[in-house]
Amino acid sequence: QTFVTELRAARAPVDGIVEGDLVVRGGGDSTLDETTLWGLAAQLRSHGITRVRGRVLVERAPFGDLTCDTVDRCTSLLRSSRAYNAVPSAIGVNYGSWCVMVRAPQGATRAQVGGCASGPLPIPLSGSVQVRAGGPALAVERVTDEAGERIAVSGSIAPGSERMVHRAMSDPPVGTGLLLRSILGQAGVTVDGGVETTLRAMGQDAWLVARVESIPLQEQVGRMMRWSNNYIADVLTMNVALKARGAAPASLADASAELTALVRRAGAGDAGDLVIESGSGLTTTNRLSAQDL
């Protein structure tokens, strides 16, 4: 089992130009990363595409709009200094987070701050990081206000060192679109418009421009277990419900009913005590005993 991410257009490109929007269609890949976006960009270039006259339009389907389901995730919509509280989405890069690399070249007084594999960050950066030993601790935070998202940095880092940190996005589909647009530009594909999202932009008959498959489901589960990754767990929970029902669940709690049914079919869990409202357990209302697991 794998999950597919596609780029589609309303019609076939002509003379290297996509007329209209470039649509990003996710398939619930919980491990989508920046290298995958580079792969999509490389496919466009291999097809001779050098320009998109419209926007990067990111579809929120097949999950739709998911609201925050825990205090941690609701708080993270405005600011986050962690990655664990990213909101699950049908399409979200780096587990729904910004990957930020802080490098301190020898001889420099200020550190370089940018993306990990995306080149420059496609959102504003505020503050600076000093290069010196024994200074205040490095602080990296994602802040969202009426102007949008930005990364705020402060503190210091030792000369010759580097730090990679992840900070939860407030809106993973938008963040994915911004990263893709930036990567396309670096790959030689000019996008005239900005980044927007929609529930569903076009049908299955839309022109397929590029396509990538995720790592196998088994490896996604392995990463979830190794890193105790909330984002993977809850995206996979949404995928389980989508597969079982053939339609998008209304919420993460609604999708988690499929996990409850699975535990009960296995003969575990007291009917009166078992509560599963997320696959990750980030929802504090979950009630499972060690015997249930």
Describe every region a protein language model picked out:
Residues 2-272:
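Conserved serine DD-peptidase/penicillin-binding transpeptidase domain
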Residues 258-261, 268-292:
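C-terminal soluble interaction/assembly domains
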